[in-house]
Regions:
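A generic structural motif
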Residues: 40-42, 94
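Charged phosphate-binding loop/patch that engages nucleotide di/tri-phosphates or the phosphate backbone
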Residues: 120-142
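Beta-rich catalytic cores
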Residues: 33
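Conserved catalytic cores of phosphodiester-cleaving nucleases, focusing on short active-site segments
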Residues: 37-39, 46-60
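Acidic-basic catalytic patches of nuclease active cores, encompassing PD-(D/E)XK
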Residues: 1-29, 42
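Mg2+/Mn2+-dependent nuclease catalytic core
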Residues: 58-78, 82
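Short, electropositive alpha-helical surface patch
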Residues: 101-128
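Nucleic-acid nuclease catalytic cores
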Residues: 80-110
Length: 142
């Protein structure tokens, strides 16, 4: 049985940064839109930050549009409610080009259909070949 793309992405993330932060995978079938992970990330300043993380695997279309097959509007609604309450959340989107997009939760409604040539301000890209400190710094910078 083959793994789903998001499962493989989770396994990569856990191997890439798991020893440098706290990651808890959430398997919630009750709360609509609850993200896939809860993480606590230590910044270079020594301050820990808690962030909810939605994992997605996506492909760029030939027109340069991001296609996220498992995108659900109620997930974006969750991020919007969480942001209004003062929380921080992100989307980590693995693309077919070997990059990971780090998208602030405030842009959750724009994830599916995002244009590569006109990324919204605040979206960061990191290579899957990056080391843990670089990945964590990019996550915390969003």
């Amino acid at each position: 049985m083959s793994r789903k793309p998001e499962q493989a992405f989770w396994e990569w993330l856990r191997r890439a940064i798991g020893k440098n932060c706290y990651l808890e995978r959430i398997e919630n079938r009750v709360g609509m839109g609850t993200p896939d992970l809860h993480g606590v990330f230590m910044g270079a300043d020594g301050i820990s930050r808690a962030i909810w993380v939605e994992l997605k695997s996506a492909q760029w279309s030939t027109q340069g549009t991001l296609r996220v097959p498992a995108y659900k509007p109620h997930q974006a609604a969750w991020h919007e409610r969480y942001l209004k309450a003062g929380g921080k959340s992100i989307y980590l989107v693995e693309t077919d080009t070997g990059e990971v997009l780090i998208i602030p939760g405030r842009l959750a409604g724009q994830v599916d259909g995002m244009m590569k040539a006109a990324m919204p301000q605040g979206v960061t890209t990191v290579s899957k070949k990056a080391k843990a400190p670089e990945i964590i710094a990019a996550i915390l910078a969003v």
